[in-house]
Curated annotation (Swiss-Prot):
N6,N6-dimethyllysine found at: 55
Residue positions where 5-glutamyl glycerylphosphorylethanolamine is found in the record: 289, 362
Predominant cellular place of this UniProt entry's protein: cytoplasm
Protein name as annotated: Elongation factor 1-alpha
GO molecular function, one term: GTP binding
Amino acid sequence: MGKEKVHINIVVIGHVDSGKSTTTGHLIYKLGGIDKRVIERFEKEAAEMNKRSFKYAWVLDKLKAERERGITIDIALWKFETSKYYCTVIDAPGHRDFIKNMITGTSQADCAVLIIDSTTGGFEAGISKDGQTREHALLAFTLGVKQMICCCNKMDATTPKYSKGRYEEIVKEVSSYLKKVGYNPDKIPFVPISGFEGDNMIERSTNLDWYKGPTLLDALDNINEPKRPSDKPLRLPLQDVYKIGGIGIVPVGRVETGVVKPGMLVTFAPTGLTTEVKSVEMHHEALTEALPGDNVGFNVKNVAVKDLKRGFVASNSKDDPAKEAANFTSQVIIMNHPGQIGNGYAPVLDCHTSHIAVKFAELITKIDRRSGKEIEKEPKFLKNGDAGMVKMIPTKPMVVETFAEYPPLGRFAVRDMRQTVAVGVIKSVEKKDPTGAKVTKAAAKKK
């Protein structure tokens, strides 16, 4: 068993009928961790319901249905392997929480797989102003998904079938759009596939012998290995805080950057409470250190439950410790707000694990969301489809960072009226020093 394969997260994006479920289902079916017995059960049910046509999509439909009914699906079902990577498919965008998940960073994707419907009419619907192809691509780029693979799907249903001309037309148009969003199309493989028939998914297809590039599986294998940010200073947003008899207080969260280890002095922002880490554990096993991506619990000394809350951020006291944000400037894209957003708007921001109302104190500029260039200074308002720079002031103590330095703490969703009305990334933060920050006895000894 040579070296462990690297884990990567893939997000599958594209218009509603582009064939995302079929394509993803196909990969999971052929390369994945779905038990053959489960597949046979699904196949039998599909046949009984005359659902032959849904060959692979129903694999996902069943998984989704079981998940939504609260049957916990073994997450291994959403995984598949290439020769180089273990791939996890994180929520495909049909899911209403997808945008929120993508932003709050429960799932940072390393690569986006954009599925395009190549059929007559299908492609045009997806790429049109109202189509989701553009919005998903823009979101992926804004949220820092640097790598992309583009699949020209349904090649078995073009006119004529497997049409090279149609493929070239699509590559040209999608490239020009992706370039406007900010991607470099020369670095994006455009793979003609049929998620349904299986052409160029895993094996090279004779139906598409004019195409000399990689299959989808090859393209996934060629993804650049993501750099995990373990060399950055520690940032660990708290998800929960437990009091465990005989042990004490155990904050729990995911290491986003840096490392945490026993004996380390940590400072919790926004309050500035400083203490020593006694032990770190993951899945009930003690660790000598936890790395980015690890969900851990760690035991801290001389701390009361009331001192820590979800949304607080643990950091290394001696290496750029996290602090409360007095205010910050963000680039936001308004996605679905029925009216106009002006100065004084105060929605809730979901950023890492915090969920805090923030005031839009000042609309600084309106920018062209395609080119990123400034269109207007101090606009009176922003409306659907607009992008702008906004100065924001939290209504309660909050910890955020710039997207450039600490990506998971620098992107957010703006929630209002029970939906995501905007998304954004933080460009700069003005921090304030904590007043009367408590240093525990254990920490004072270590200093």
